Amino acid sequence: GATQLHPERFDFVEFLETVAGRLLIDTPDADFDLQYELPEHPVYVNTDKSRMEQVLDNLIVNAKRNVNPGGVLKLSLKESEDMLDFSVFNQGPPIPQENLSKIWTKFYRDKNSKYSGSGLGLAIVAQILSMQHLIYGVENQPGGVAFYFSIPTVK
């Protein structure tokens, strides 16, 4: 069922580049400035690869939908102690304070969103990350919004 996780060890840096490439490089008409801030070496994690792909898919597509025309979309991976911190930042309008906590619920959709959709994407992200007891969140930053999570690294 939905609760089965099948962890495997893999390089998260290469994995992110592959997933992001599939989602972002193939959009020649895309009007944004894609930036990466990634380690120059492999960083291994032990997690369910297909679930993590769903997480990245949803977070990256969400950022792509909300980035201002010509704005920055930035993917970052930072190592700290035994953790790898992922974030995706998009320049764009802030999320109203009262909506920040609601954004992870099943049918939340920003009424200002230009896109129709089920609103399930972020709920799926929350479910998968919670199942693995990973810390995740969203915050307004100067000029935009960042979604983030942290995952333990393995040797």
Segments (PLM) and residue ranges:
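Conserved micro-motifs of the catalytic ATP-binding
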Residues: 1-5, 44-47
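A conserved beta-strand-to-alpha-helix junction within the catalytic ATP-binding
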Residues: 6-24
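Conserved catalytic submotifs in the C-terminal HATPase_c
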Residues: 6-9, 28, 33-43
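Conserved polar catalytic motif of the HATPase_c/GHKL fold
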Residues: 57-58, 62
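Short conserved segment of the HATPase_c
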Residues: 95-107
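Short alpha-helical Gxxx[C/S/T] motif in the catalytic ATP-binding
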Residues: 121, 125
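Glycine-rich ATP-binding loops of the HATPase_c
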Residues: 133-139
